[in-house]
């Protein structure tokens, strides 16, 4: 409500006076648009934008190429009808025929691939580990990486080699130690075995 004590403008022409409480608030400035009481601010600015867009689009396309863009604000009625048909009846204008020159083998291949993709998706989403992997999506690995040979070990140090050789069952010492502490070489034992072999 407007009061004189608030410093509002008072005039003798009642038709020109609009109380400040009834005036629309400031909602931004659009040049050339006067916001009236008959239409809302959104409709006025939207119509201004559409008119500006129509004038720009009429200058943007060449004759006999491209044509007009369908819009709801246009003096041309076919453009408005085209826009309505594209928005409302777009499913009615979908083609009802199907291609008869499709490659059936390729179609079957794509269908099977889609099924395998869904199986792999279920495998990824499985938290229990019941589902198995799809072999189609298993990346190939070289045979040595999958089945490593036990001999392909890192090289051993000299001390480790000596310990392994000493503890192996194939290791034969080249001498024999008697209780007296005397060591006899293997060649001398062979000569003794030849001599004492034929004793009665």
From Swiss-Prot:
Signal peptide from the UniProt entry: none
Main localization of the protein described in the UniProt heading: cytoplasm
Keyword Cytoplasm on entry: yes
Keyword hit for Transport: no
Keywords: Cell projection, Cilium, Cytoplasm, Cytoskeleton, Flagellum
Subcellular location: Cytoplasm, Cytoskeleton, Cilium axoneme; Cytoplasm, Cytoskeleton, Flagellum axoneme
Cellular component terms (Gene Ontology): axonemal A tubule inner sheath; axonemal microtubule; sperm flagellum
Taxonomic superkingdom: Eukaryota
Pfam assignment, any one: CMI2B-like
One GO biological process term: flagellated sperm motility
PANTHER family noted in UniProt: PROTEIN FAM166C, UPF0573 PROTEIN C2ORF70
Family affiliation: Belongs to the CIMIP2 family.
Function: Microtubule inner protein (MIP) part of the dynein-decorated doublet microtubules (DMTs) in cilia axoneme, which is required for motile cilia beating. Binds to the intra-tubulin interfaces.
Subunit structure: Microtubule inner protein component of sperm flagellar doublet microtubules.
Protein name: Ciliary microtubule inner protein 2C
Taxonomy of the source species: Eukaryota, Metazoa, Chordata, Craniata, Vertebrata
């Amino acid at each position: 409500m407007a009061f004189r004590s608030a410093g509002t403008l008072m005039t003798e022409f009642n038709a020109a006076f609009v109380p400040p409480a009834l005036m629309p608030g400031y909602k931004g400035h659009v040049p050339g648009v006067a916001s009236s009481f008959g239409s809302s601010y959104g409709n006025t600015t939207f119509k201004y934008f559409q008119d500006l867009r129509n004038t720009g689009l009429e200058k943007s396309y060449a004759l006999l190429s491209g044509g007009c863009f369908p819009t709801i604000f246009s003096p041309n009625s076919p453009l408005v009808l085209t826009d309505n048909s594209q928005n409302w009846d777009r499913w009615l204008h979908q083609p009802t025929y199907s291609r008869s020159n499709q490659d059936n083998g390729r179609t079957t291949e794509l269908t099977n691939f889609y099924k395998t993709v869904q199986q792999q998706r279920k495998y990824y989403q499985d938290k229990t580990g019941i589902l198995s992997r799809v072999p189609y999506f298993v990346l190939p690995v070289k045979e040595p990486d999958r089945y490593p040979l036990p001999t392909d070990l890192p090289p051993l140090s000299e001390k480790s080699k000596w310990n392994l050789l000493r503890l192996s069952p194939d290791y034969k010492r080249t001498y024999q130690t008697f209780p007296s502490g005397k060591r006899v070489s293997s060649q001398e034992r062979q000569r003794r075995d030849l001599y004492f072999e034929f004793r009665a």
